[in-house]
Curated annotation (Swiss-Prot):
Molecular calcium-binding chaperone promoting folding, oligomeric assembly and quality control in the ER via the calreticulin/calnexin cycle. This lectin may interact transiently with almost all of the monoglucosylated glycoproteins that are synthesized in the ER. Pfam families: Calreticulin. An alpha-D-glucoside binds at Y115, K117, Y134, D141, E324. GO terms for biological process: ERAD pathway; protein folding. It is found in: Endoplasmic reticulum lumen. Can be divided into a N-terminal globular domain, a proline-rich P-domain forming an elongated arm-like structure and a C-terminal acidic domain. The P-domain binds one molecule of calcium with high affinity, whereas the acidic C-domain binds multiple calcium ions with low affinity. The interaction with glycans occurs through a binding site in the globular lectin domain. It comes from Beta vulgaris (Sugar beet). Keywords: Calcium, Chaperone, Disulfide bond, Endoplasmic reticulum, Glycoprotein, Lectin, Metal-binding, Repeat, Signal, Zinc. This is Calreticulin. Disulfide bonds join C111-C143. Residues 382-400 have a biased composition (Acidic residues). Residues 217-241, 351-381, 401-416 have a biased composition (Basic and acidic residues). GO terms for cellular component: endoplasmic reticulum lumen; endoplasmic reticulum membrane. The lineage of its organism: Eukaryota, Viridiplantae, Streptophyta, Embryophyta, Tracheophyta. Sequence repeats lie at residues 197-208, 216-227, 233-244, 251-262, 266-276, 280-290, 294-304.
């Protein structure tokens, strides 16, 4: 029998090549929040004067897949949060940029951010806040029913530009990994839990540059342009007597009341009702216009204001990563922050952390939810009484069934 399997040496070569590619990845910043993390991160004093600065907890959360894998979590409601870390300055020119992190909303978030930022140049980390310029902002944002999306915002020429596509974010209480990939050809991908959710181009999905083509402002619709798709049928004629049909007629079912007195009530007149034969003003039926040319559109021309930027994707002085957000309800946990140039390395990191822990985390969450529901049932006397009544009704029903069964057995016994 012919062996159609892969040559073991070939598979080994593929594995080695894959490992080599990952090993050659440039990692500009990687934070798993292990020992010493506080030396790498600077807590901002932004909003402290107003007593509105929130504190961070170092924790693995109330439920997790590994109690030893910790991150930083917002801990106070109705607070602003700002924290950042510095890494050696680099440019993503001619290279792929990968920005990835995990986030978990333990608080059943109803309004608050879960995004992170990449910043360039010189930043006073102690003053890092909402007004600090940034290069890229990326991650989930939730507020009410209307906002449940992934932000992907680019700063270009000192203006922040939001992505024009809608990318829904995860809204449960489990950990999810968000990945943004920006390539030298100005294309991008957004991944959630290693699954691509959106992809496209900086040229089309953001308004970073003026449009390449615009409608010709000098163009005018030709006078003989027929844009009526349907026209009245010239062969259709109005039926004879059509205009003589009244809109209302006397109700043939109406009868003069027996107690009607003409001398006192006046002459009785039957009420009128809509005439079922009346069809309204006559209109000729519509037919397709044989001269229809379609809806007129101005021709597109080159936009004189468009100037291409081959370095549209480039951020030459990336140097910081930070979290800056407002939360109505706290409990968001950030972990496993990565800035690198290799999507495969990012994928591997996600699998080594989130991938290995997700099932255990989900099981732990479901167990806690089960206990919480049981406790709420115990603490709710109305619900407990209702359950007792249901049980009592069930017992009475069982008793009635048993009595009926006994009576039936007695009847059968008498017949015997």
């Amino acid at each position: 029998m012919e062996n159609r399997g892969r040559n073991p040496s070939f598979l080994s070569l593929l594995l080695l090549l894959s490992l080599f590619a990952i090993a050659s990845a440039k990692v500009f910043f990687e934070e798993r929040f292990e020992d010493g993390w506080e030396k790498r991160w600077v807590k901002s004093e932004w909003k402290k004067d107003e007593s509105m600065a929130g504190e961070w907890n170092y924790t693995s959360g109330k439920w997790n897949g590994d109690a030893n894998d910790k991150g930083i979590q917002t801990s106070e409601d109705y607070r602003f949060y700002a924290i950042s870390a510095e890494f050696p300055e680099f440019s993503n020119k001619d290279n792929t940029l990968v920005f990835q992190f995990s986030v978990k909303h333990e608080q059943k978030l109803d309004c608050g951010g879960g995004y992170m930022k990449l910043l360039s140049g010189e930043v006073d980390q102690k003053k890092f806040g909402g007004d600090t310029p940034y290069s890229i902002m990326f991650g989930p944002d939730i507020c009410g029913y209307s906002t449940k999306k992934v932000h992907a915002i680019f700063n270009y020429n000192d203006t922040n530009h939001l992505i024009k596509k809608d990318v829904p974010c995860e809204t449960d209480q489990l950990t999810h990994v968000y990945t943004f990939i920006l390539r030298p050809d100005a294309t991008y991908s957004i991944l959630i839990d290693n699954q691509e959710k959106q992809t496209g181009s900086l040229y089309t999905d953001w308004d970073l540059l003026p449009a390449k083509k615009i409608k010709d402002p000098e163009a005018k619709k030709p006078e003989d342009w027929d844009d009526k798709e349907f026209i009245p049928d010239p062969e259709d004629k109005k039926p004879e007597g059509y205009d003589d049909i009244p809109a209302e007629i006397t109700d043939p079912e109406a009868k003069k009341p027996e107690d009607w007195d003409d001398e006192e009530d006046g002459e009785w007149t039957a009420p009128t009702i809509p005439n079922p034969e009346y069809k309204g003003p006559w209109k000729a039926k519509k037919i397709k216009n044989p001269n229809y040319k379609g809806k007129w559109k101005a021709p597109m021309i080159d936009n004189p204001e468009f100037k291409d930027d081959p370095e549209l994707y480039v951020y030459p002085k990336l140097r910081y990563v930070g979290v800056e957000l407002w939360q109505v309800k706290s409990g968001t946990l950030f972990d496993n922050v990565l800035v690198c140039d290799d999507p495969e390395y990012a994928k591997q990191l996600a699998e080594e952390t989130w991938g290995k822990q997700k099932d255990a985390e989900k099981a732990a969450f479901e167990e806690l939810e089960k206990k919480r529901e049981e406790e709420e049932t115990k603490d709710d006397p109305v619900e407990s009484d209702a359950e007792d009544e249901d049980e009592a009704e069930a017992d009475d029903s069982d008793k009635d069934d048993a009595d009926k069964s006994d009576d039936k057995d007695d009847d059968q016994h008498d017949e015997l």
